[in-house]
Amino acid sequence: MRRVGFLVALMVSALFVACGGGGGDGDDASESAPSRVFLSLGTAPPGGTFFVFGSALAETMNEFGGGFGWNTTAEATSGSQENIRRLDSGELDFALSNAAITYFAVRGTEGWEKAYQMRTVMTLAPNVALWISPADSGVETMADLRGQRVGVGVAGAGFEYFIRPLLGAHGITYDDITPLNATQSGAVDLLADGSAAAVFVGGAIPNPAITQASASQEINFIPFDETAKQQLIDEYLFFR
């Protein structure tokens, strides 16, 4: 992440030089090609919005950052939790991360072994938390999740950092359900073959997993209790 901050500052400086350098001979500058800078962008598994956003962002950076020698590659990862650790180790130059997971990582709480030093470059889009179930499953409220097999995201991706508060606000814990780990597209398959009664498919809108699920069957969007929503907003900054 520090490397990206440097590159952004360098880009701004180069623009100022280009605009304010009148009187000099521009031929030398036009003939010298910039050094190639290879950048890696951590996204998430295919099937979610992070992978789509990340791939588009990498293409945009290559298109408009070519003058600075940028060559950006979007990497499929397990998601925010892996991205944060790989940023810290230097394996990634920058990455996408969910606000809830980042919130705990920078504080070194809720299972994070240390406080991770990161810099936010920009906000992409609101991350919408959605629970869906087949229309004929009988799961229509959050309370109906008790005793059910429920898709809770990829193992190790950090979904639990916001799923646990969402469930907890409704008086539900992981002990009350049978949690199933899968990518978002994999979670939709679990619904389709009856392996899960409901799944979590958080992300920005439009979410490819929602499109995939609704194309093959009728689905319910499970609503949040209004009191639980207010409790989450009051307790956690990332739900505001």
Kindly label every feature range from the protein language model.
Residues R36-F64, N127-S195:
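Bilobed "Venus flytrap"/periplasmic-binding protein-like clamshell domains
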Residues A99-I101, G108-E110, S137, T173-R240:
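Pocket-lining segment of extracytoplasmic ligand-binding domains
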